[in-house]
A protein has these predicted regions:
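Basic, polyanion-binding surface patches
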Residues: 1-145
């Protein structure tokens, strides 16, 4: 994957996959600890059985892609390809636009992950992990001294 691409892997049975395939667009909304309860609730409800559009405040971009207003970082993406694996659809996406809350940006306008502390969902244990601690600089561990 290049720096301008992401992969979004969703269980093939998810209702939202239909809309993504129809529209060839999606938004990836980064979850932080403040947003976690609502995000978890969203995962507990099937969109085929209940309207989840009222779980989050959202805005639409120019192409009509919903973006969660409370998300500290949102990427609007176009689907380039779909790779199917057992039970999953993997959407290969180009990032068309990215939006970040000012409070998670450095003075240079880059995302500060120490401030953002995105939550990761770890699949085998079904646990949420908070990130954000710097443990070293890239290419600093393997250099000869």
């Amino acid at each position: 994957m290049g720096h301008d691409h992401i992969m979004v892997s969703l269980a093939a049975a998810h209702y939202t996959n239909q809309g993504i395939k129809e529209n060839k667009k999606l938004s990836a909304n980064i979850v932080d600890e403040a947003l976690l309860e609502k995000a978890d609730r969203s995962g507990c409800i099937s969109g085929s059985k209940a309207d989840k559009s009222d779980l989050f405040e959202y805005t639409l971009d120019d192409a009509g892609v919903p973006m969660i207003s409370q998300s500290p970082v949102t990427m609007v993406c176009s689907v380039e390809d779909i790779y199917k694996t057992t039970g999953f659809e993997n959407f290969i996406c180009t990032i068309d636009a990215a939006y970040a809350a000012e409070e998670v940006l450095t003075e240079e306008g880059k995302i500060d992950y120490r401030t953002l502390k995105p939550v990761l969902f770890e699949m085998p244990t079904y646990e949420y992990l908070k990130t954000g601690d710097v443990i070293g600089k890239c290419m600093s561990f393997g250099k000869e001294k």
